[in-house]
Amino acid sequence: VYFGEYLLMVTPMFWAWVGQTMFFNRFGEKIKLPELYMLPQMFFLILMTASFDLTFSNTYYTFLIGYLGIRIITVIQYFVISRQLRGNPRRVAILLGSVFLLGVITTATSVFFDGSVRYLVMYLGIAIDIVLPLFLSKTLQKVPVDFPHLAERFGLFVIIT
C-alpha cells in the first residue's frame, strides 16, 4: 500500500523534473532571466515535498498545487521562448507548450473527483504529457535534446530520490 502511494507521489515529481530538464536542455541558453522561473518552481517543489504523507489523500490538494505550479511555469516558459524563436525551434516550443498545457488542464480537473478516480485523472494528464510528444517525434527531432546532459540529470534525480 505504501509503495503504491509512494509511486503516486514520486511519479508526478519525476515528471515535473523531466519537463523542466527537457525545456532547459532545448532552450535554456536562450531564455532571459531563468531564475525568475526557477525560484517559483523551487517553491512549488518544496510544497510537493512537504505534502509527502503516508495518507496521500490528506495532502493531495497541496501536492497538486505544487505539481501544477511547476508544470504551468514550464508551459509559460515554452510560450515565452517561442516568441524569441523562428522556424523549427519556434514550432517545437509552441507544440510542446500546447501539449503540456493540455496535460496541465487534464491533471487540474482531478480536483473534481474523489478516491481512485482522482488519481486516474491526474495520471491521465501526465500520460498526455508523456505520450503525445512520442507521436510528434519527427517534429521534435528538428530541435534535438542533448542526451549526455539528460543522462546526467536523470542520474542525479535517481540519487536524490
Where is each model-derived feature located?
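Multi-pass alpha-helical transmembrane bundle typical of ion/small-solute transporters
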Residues: 1-161
